[in-house]
Amino acid sequence: MNDASPASGTPVLDVWCELQCPDCRSALDDLRALRARYGDRLELRLRHFPLEKHKHAFAAAQAAEEALEQGKGWEYVEAVLGRVEELDRAGEPFLVEVARELGLDAEEFDTALVDGRHILIVDADQAEGKAIGVTGTPTYVIDGERLDGGKSQEGLRERVAEIVDRLLAGQG
């Protein structure tokens, strides 16, 4: 998932995430800090990696793609991650409610979840993640380097920043 269209040569941080994952919620602060620091000089790209242990994760990934299609991908992701417990309790109706709260077309959202129009995107992300060794979320990939998050987020923001700074310095 990618809301932006960065200039070519912009470093890309792939964020393998799952919207029912408490560790991904914790990682939001790091992602916000990286966006604040780099702005358009870093492309953050959400990659879906729904885990079987979270029963609403696959639907949430599809919902995030529908939100992207309607123009509010990252806003939606942040809203859902900020309320993981509600997703745990309410499931798909919660996903549609968040869309409504953000001013998205909730009816179209519901239809997208029923007809599965975004399943192939989610499946492709998950397959690619498995192929490169992603086993849990969050996992970051930048410049070919995989950085595993999960319960130990400490130091990841700094490590990503080191790599981005190195890549940006190489462009000058």
Task: Describe each PLM feature range.
Residues 2-9:
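Short beta-strand-to-loop junctions in surface cap/lid or active-site-entrance loops
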Residues 8, 50, 63, 82-85, ...:
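A general structural-boundary detector
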Residues 5, 53-55, 138, 151:
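Solvent-exposed, flexible loop/coil residues
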Residues 10, 16, 23-36, 97-172:
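C-terminal cap of thioredoxin/glutaredoxin-like
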Residues 2, 50-52, 148:
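Generic, ordered loop/turn and secondary-structure boundary motif
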Residues 12-100, 170:
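Structural alpha/beta surface segment adjacent to cysteine/selenocysteine redox centers
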